[in-house]
Amino acid sequence: MSYVSAILSDNRRKVKVWIRDDKGQRTIQEFDAPYYFYIPNEDGTDIDIKGNSISRLDFQNPSDFFNARKKYEENGISLYESDIQPQYKILSEHFYGKEITQLNVTFFDIEVDYDKDIGFSSVDNPYAPVSSIAIYHQRTDETIVLAVPPETRPDFTQDDVPQDIEDEAIVVICKDEKELLQMFFKEIEDSDIISGWNSEFFDVPYIYERANTVLYKTAGNKLCFPNSREPYYREVEKFGNMQKALVIHGRVHLDYLDVYKNFEMAMKPSYKLEHVADDELPHLPKLKYEGSLYSLYRDDFEEFIRYNIRDTVILKGLEDKKKYIETAVQMSHMSTSQIVDVLGTIKVAESAIINFCHYDMGVRVPDHKAPESTGKKYGGATVIDPKVGMHEYSASVDLQSLYPGIMRSLNISPESIRGQFAERGVAFGLIRDESDKKVTFIEEATGEVISAPANQWRRVLDRKNWAISGLGTVFDLETEGVIPAVLTKWFAERKEYKKKMWEAKQAGDAAMEEFWDRMQYIKKIQLNSMYGACGNRFFKFFDVRLAESTTLTGREVLYHMARQIALELNGEYDMEADAIIYGDTDSIYFKTYKDNPQDALDLANEVCDAINASYPEFMSRVFLCDDKRAQIMKAEQEIVSDRGIYIEKKYYMLHLVANDGEFVDKMKYMGVPIKTTKLPSEIKDKLANFIERLLKGEDWDIIGPEVVHFKDLLFGLNDITLLGTPKGVNKVETNTVIFNSGDIEGRKKIAGHCRASILWNKCLDSYGDNESPRIMSGSKVLVYDLTRKIDGYFTSIAVPKDIDIPPPWFFEHFAPIVDKKSQVKKLVDDPMRVMISAAGIKVPTKKKLVFEEGLFG
């Protein structure tokens, strides 16, 4: 039995929970809203996370609850669990640990018509009708498309639908938009979760607005479950502007764009559905068409239907491959949070800790009031500057779950804090080095301030079984803290799930292998999210010292790993030693001094073993961890590269010959243009080929002339659309106001690609183009440098990346003055320079090749 969602009734007296039972039926259950909290009481039968006695106070109604809470707060009395919303209390009480059943998921995509004289319709101005909606129901494995024929095809009927479309979907031809919307609401009646691509800011609010306009005033409420609350808009800042997002109740709406971003481990150069589909589902490319969607709808209605269907089929394909919505459901239910909470940063972790406190530890948690924002950011991950250049046979070791491991090793948890050294990290260093300099300790419970020599404090901490972090925060090791206890449980569960995944793989059970892989992935996400949550002031267990202690301790742990590698390979405990190439967060890259993959891998494994053997003594000596906790930190051998270029922090390119102990032949890119930029795929693939050949040992004298030839080909292209420089643009609206104001100084501060976007929008007005989209904040654009200024100000023009072919006026007035030389430099020379100059290699030019051939040929 799984819950879909839970809401508090309008009068706050009931909690409504929608449930999908074991028979697949959706029902609604109502519970009395629980109103209670705990207060300190020496005779109380409950205890808090610090072991103090507390007692529970129950209230008959919300008014009594809030009045009592206010009274206790005004009297300075600590409260427990008064800030947990009733719906979360109900979910925890009734659904924790329950088996998770399948929910009904529906993917959909809408297509909207527009008037060429008015331009594109939007949520703010939803004047145009919905032309078609493609739907995929996961439960029934059915694809359905609802479509209204254009005025150019008034006699189009069901019989006119081509067979290839009928083979792919159930097509329902609607007489008008009213019928289409009515049928859409009927289709989603049994859907628990609806999902589209960028549906939060377009599809869902647009359907809501059109239903209210075309059907009746509150028809859009059908997006919610019956007997639920009415939807409402919330404002979200996006790309520097405020946008409206519709919040629905009962039925869950998950924007798959957000889901994908949230769960996908690696950043993508572009999150346009077309690019994601090309990357993830090459067999399901987004369909392309010539001209505008306006023309496609009227001139080729059949292809228009295919286009709509394909977008929804892509969403199905992504979920089939990634299982991200299924993961979101399982993750939320394991912590008894709402499904939409998975897209946030703290609620799932918070709910999981509260459940652990209740059901594993039998304790209650204190209220939390978010402190005022200081505007300060705590230190992030540690990076060791690279030895820039090309290195042969390098390898890396990686710390297992670095931040969760540190929190477990030092028992980092709010209730475990015993005090803070005023000198922070300086005090930590002095105590580690057993200095006789005085440091000052501020006792947590009493605020008492005590100064004593660092070496004396070391003995005191050791005697009391207290650990010290890299921040100088002191944690009691006597009783396991709530956060380390949760992390230990998750770590053990992940280990068990990975074991079961391996057993299923050995048994040839693909379904169970996939299930356990997803379960271990959820635990990985939970483990990695805890540190970030602890640094969020809205987190119930927030204390910035928890996050800072973790990162600064992590720095020392990483430094030790680098020094230990140097000790093994160079005989000196010094991370500046020759062997150390680079370090980042939890990984160290180092020279193996070998000349073949097997020897390099063997050496890397030996180094890893030596690191692991050194950690117990290091953790005990440096942080005063007890014997058990000193065993937690572990490193794993990660990669071996026969040739790689280390460029700068977070920028490197490696050809791998081994990965996780297995011999491979593949590339690893970090930060470099062919990994992070939105270069046209044709150019990106070509540059990647040049780099791969270089790192596999091919002579640059052979590759260089091919680079020059490739640039010549680009320069000679008649079609300049391939030469646009990809950019993301923000604050277009704000900067347009500045531009139109005539403020000379203000205009100078407008970024070049934003200026180019303003020019595009001006051209739409000048040429009377209502078919091409305007560039707005958040748009992806292609920028073209020009050989001369336009209006004495514009040196480039942008084109929206969403359109396949620019309008005729662009080719007539701008294509002839595109600066091809500048564009090729930006697309080829500049990215290549970033990637190869660190190895002492120059980007080849025709002039340079002719000169060298003349001298040495």
What is each stretch, according to the model?
Residues 1-190, 219, 309-310, 314-333, ...:
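DnaQ-like (DEDDh/DEDDy) 3′-5′ exonuclease domain used for proofreading
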Residues 184-207:
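Proline-aspartate-enriched helix->loop->beta-strand connector
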Residues 285, 558-585:
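Active-site palm subdomain of RNA-directed nucleic acid polymerases
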Residues 291-415, 420-421, 509-564, 582, ...:
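Common nucleic-acid-contacting/processivity interface regions adjacent to the catalytic cores
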Residues 588-607:
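Catalytic palm subdomain of template-directed nucleic-acid polymerases
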